[in-house]
Amino acid sequence: AGYDMWEGPYGNWGSRKYLLASLDQSLKRMGLEYVDIFYHHRPDPETPLEETMGALAQAVQSGKALYVGLSNYDGATMQQACAILKELHCPFVINQNCYSMLNRTIEQNGLLDACAEEQKGLIVFSPLAQGLLTDRYLHGIPADSRMRTDGRFLNEKQLTPERLQLLQKLQAAAQARGQKLAQLAMHWIL
């Protein structure tokens, strides 16, 4: 939870009302009684961290989630959340953050060190940078691509001439290794 679930107040971010209602809706859609991990997908600048973590703990205490995960938190905020969840005796086990050859933010924002210090797991999303680290965009933007038709997470501004040149250099490096660009990107992550 953390992104748009419905229009209007409390349809987004990290309030108790939003988190618990979105969990209930997700469980109903999936036909499940509980999820293994309930993620909060982004820190909420308007809601106190204590409220957000309290809602996650309530989800576990009610039996609707076995564990808690966080996504898109930096190191310092994750450690604050971890301290709150420890006080609430809530099992926080994993972080999920964007990481790729093109997005290395977690190396600079303290998350890697915080995960090691707190002994929390880390799983990445978008290791292919929304498809940029594939052969799809090596020669520009295809007419039928998400970049042209959607643009919410991948848009034309992200494929600058400099970025395209970098992708072509990475493609050459991948070919020198007998790989496709996507394979090189996945090996880099591992």
Place the predicted regions along the sequence by residue.
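Active-site groove signature of glycoside hydrolases
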Residues: 27-47
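Residues in well-ordered alpha-helical elements
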Residues: 17, 33-36, 50, 182
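Active-site mouth loops of central-metabolism enzymes
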Residues: 3-20, 41-47
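Short, acidic/polar
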Residues: 12-30, 78-82
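Beta/alpha (TIM)-barrel catalytic core signal, keyed to glycine-rich beta->alpha loops juxtaposed to Asp/Glu
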Residues: 45-190
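Short, small-residue-rich loop/turn micro-motifs
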Residues: 1, 34, 126
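A short, structured active-site edge motif that brings together acidic residues
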Residues: 1-5, 96-99
